Amino acid sequence: MKEREKKYIALWQVMQRECRRLVSRPLYLFCMVIAPLFCYIFFTTLMDSGLPKDLPARVVDMDDSSTSRNIVRNLDAFSQTGVVAHYSNVTDARIAMQEGKIYGFFYLPKGLSAEAQSQRQPTISFYTNYSYLIAGSLLFRDMKMMGELTSGAAARTMLYAKGATENQAMAYLQPIVIDTHPLNNPWLNYSVYLCNTLIPGVLMLLIFMVTVYSIGVEIKDRTAREWLRMSNNSIYIALAGKLLPHTIVFFIMGIFYNVYLYGFLHFPCNSGIFPMIFATLCLVLASQCCGIVMIGTLPTLRLGLSFASLWGVISFSISGFSFPVMAMHPVLQALSNLFPLRHYFLIYVDQALNGYSMAYSWTNYMALLIFMMLPFFVVHRLKEALVYYKYIP
């Protein structure tokens, strides 16, 4: 019993020591509280409208007829497209697009109205700048739809002139009606699409960095032996006492972003907020354990931080929220399982979007649990580094 009490006392002393270190260095306050809060507010307010609106586009109207002006007005009525000016020739419009003043332009050739009425199939052209993927894609969608609507309106007018009824004309123009229902994010809101993974990803990256730094700085400042002596030379007590205060702070920050996203901003959360809070706790613990592995594998502060930053940044690309993993190379599909953010993203899709039970995502929870077990493979190497390694500036 006395031995167990000594362990609890040692754990408490290490936690007190770490709390003193946390409040004595502003870097911890910035990385654990200020930076996450800034990212929460920054990303959610950056895309608060959901989709970009009134993207600047221009029109080259060589026809200048009532038909062409009606087309321009209808194009400007789309919420994503804002017709800001007219050009008299294609060259000026192309130069403006290359200079970044507009994201695209719509070209209406001379004689458009006359050729449409005489069934000579005039050609409408539109150009979008895909150097800006989102802006180019949205303008392309609006301009393509406007071209299809213009073609359909011309054909409908011709059918009416031939005596067809409205039902006959619509059956000819659209023999099959498509009823589209986007699932889980019916508003096509980019904030819902990105923030639910970007914000946990930023928190995960900060956990990597803070965990590596808090252990690596003990080696750099030559206080590692003092830290171990306070923990009765137990690396497990030393790590638990050091990282438990971090866990509490980061978990509070995780609860905050869940309440902020699903309670305040009302993002889709079909299974309730508590499964997502539990997934956040698993992500925090898995990220801390990955940080231990990083500094245990490379027990140098600069190399450990480089490892943490590289692994964290790659997580955003390979987790699958921006580009589907199933479309990646098979090797990358396998490697994606080595990143905690990937499993958190899959849990988010199952729980928040699809509303499945937690049992449906058991493989992803098991993967996060495996990440929590990884430090057992490096703790002895890490202890040797804490005792014998000499930091070389």
Which residues are covered by each model-predicted region?
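Extracytoplasmic/periplasmic domains immediately adjacent to an N-terminal transmembrane anchor
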Residues: 1-190, 385, 392-393
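Alpha-helical membrane-protein architecture signal
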Residues: 8, 12-16, 192, 231-232, ...
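Residues that define the loop-to-transmembrane-helix transition and helix capping
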Residues: 26-27, 236, 302
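Hydrophobic alpha-helical segments typical of transmembrane helices
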Residues: 67-71, 211, 223, 347
